[in-house]
Amino acid sequence: MNLIPTVIEQTNRGERAYDIYSRLLKDRIIMLGSAIDDNVANSIVSQLLFLAAEDPEKEISLYINSPGGSITAGMAIYDTMQFIKPKVSTICIGMAASMGAFLLAAGEKGKRYALPNSEVMIHQPLGGAQGQATEIEIAAKRILLLRDKLNKVLAERTGQPLEVIERDTDRDNFKSAEEALEYGLIDKILTHTEDKK
């Protein structure tokens, strides 16, 4: 069972209780703190769209601590980040792996961050298939197309040549915050909240 903390806010109109995620959303902070599936993606996309409608000029911060997950769900978040007008900064806390790393790199260039002890892991898509030979062939072709699409976006987002991305994503490739910075997955390592400004 997941308990969600409640925070009490005092205003001149009295007290108001929020669940922590609603309170963070009020400050334009979205938390991706789980594996990425369709439900998580729908929640993140809804929050992005809400904040974009509320103020199309004000930056949104997406904090990521995720082992990755579904490619199609992750691409829904990615496409929405590119689609909306507000700039989306990304901050890795803990681990951004697989699709989590992809979304970290997808933040506004110059506004992609990691905390000092966080880790980033990139790799090629994982998948499986069963059934008749033709169905397996169709699934294999699809996963290869997805791999090529993800690699092209990562090359564009990091500034690395496509061949380097293809080589480096062949297996699980873990990077410290410093290595992620050198690689171009992030733009800065944050040690204090003021560093983000």
Swiss-Prot record:
MF terms in GO: ATP-dependent peptidase activity; ATPase binding; identical protein binding; serine-type endopeptidase activity
Effect recorded for L25S: Protein no longer oligomerizes, loss of protease activity
Primary location: cytoplasm
A single cellular component GO annotation: endopeptidase Clp complex
Induction per the UniProt record: By heat shock, salt stress, ethanol stress, oxidative stress, glucose limitation and oxygen limitation.
The enzyme's E.C. designation: 3.4.21.92
Family indicated by similarity: Belongs to the peptidase S14 family.
Role of this protein: Cleaves peptides in various proteins in a process that requires ATP hydrolysis. Has a limited peptidase activity in the absence of ATP-binding subunits ClpC, ClpE or ClpX. Has a chymotrypsin-like activity. Plays a major role in the degradation of misfolded proteins. ClpXP is involved in the complete degradation of the site-2 clipped anti-sigma-W factor RsiW. This results in the release of SigW and the transcriptional activation of genes under the control of the sigma-W factor. Probably the major protease that degrades proteins tagged by trans-translation.
HAMAP family: ClpP (MF_00444)
Protein name: ATP-dependent Clp protease proteolytic subunit
